[in-house]
Amino acid sequence: MSENSKVKFTTNKGVFVAEIFEDKAPNTAKNFLDLVNKGFYDGIIFHRVIDGFMIQGGDPTGTGMGDPGYKIKDEFGEGLKHDDEGVLSMANAGPNTGGSQFFITLAPTPWLDGHHAIFG
């Protein structure tokens, strides 16, 4: 089996790298990596930052309302939990409404399990 991809995030607060779980959330990972490779996320801000909870980005409008023009189905990989800081998940407005927006947890957030697809 091939190794999972890694994506580098460059922000005004520094640089970090995320492993993308192509092995555990293949459809969600493919969607995210396709957007990365198309340059969709280039220059997009983290429009929502909640200390002790999460940072959210991936909206081309910067308002929290933007998307790539389509929605993807939720994908909940076996064993994936919001049990630590640094979990990368799809943001959504309800079931099967993810697209491009994502968030990274700053603490364990178990109430999000089964509601937001983890892919990194």
Language model features with spans:
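Cyclophilin-like peptidyl-prolyl cis-trans isomerases
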Residues: M1-F119
